[in-house]
Amino acid sequence: IYLAGASMAGFVDGETVSMRDLLYGAVVPSGAEATEALAQAVAGSEEAFVTMMNEKAAALGLTSTHFMNTSGLHDEDHYSTVREIALILQAALQNEVCAEVLSAENYRASRTEQHPDGLAMTNKFLYRVHHEYSLGGAEITAAKTGYTAEAMNCCASAGKTPDGRSVICVTANAWTGEFCIEDHIALDSKYCGSAESE
């Protein structure tokens, strides 16, 4: 995963890390080393965990989703659709721990010998949305971004409209991370209320 250029949370070889810290490391900064460590801890190998991922996708009724790895790196047989990613996010948010992690703007991992102050992480999408935009009464409460050269910048977000309705938005193929944010803000503005940059 290092050689493939995957994004990392910052954990290092030999570091003892809790499952909680790995979960945050996998989601908040999209740490591929965290997803691989979680897979090893839960299923014994990445391959076995990917099998579990595909079984879960089938249990959710997804017919256009297939996983080949835990990092999201490109593979011709690793694919989904924006609709099915929305269904995955909807299911994840029903899990209390997943909802907490997906909603975290910032997180600091426990102190370790390698990171005496704890590894600091930021969900840059949520940070930008929360601090640089006014959403006109609507709220983006959770988000997970992703990037590959093939899919470009993608994001799945969840939020609330001013009248309290739950909304999930999934976008793909944005040229930059900034465009990805602007896509979500534009959709929020159109369907959930006004949104203005501060």
Predicted features and spans:
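A short acidic, often aromatic-flanked loop/helix-cap motif at beta-alpha or helix-coil junctions
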Residues: 1-2, 75
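Conserved catalytic neighborhood of penicillin-recognizing serine enzymes
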Residues: 2-36, 116-133, 140
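Alpha-helical scaffold elements that line and support the substrate/ligand-binding pocket
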Residues: 22, 26-43, 49-53, 85-88
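Penicillin-recognizing serine hydrolase domain
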Residues: 44-198
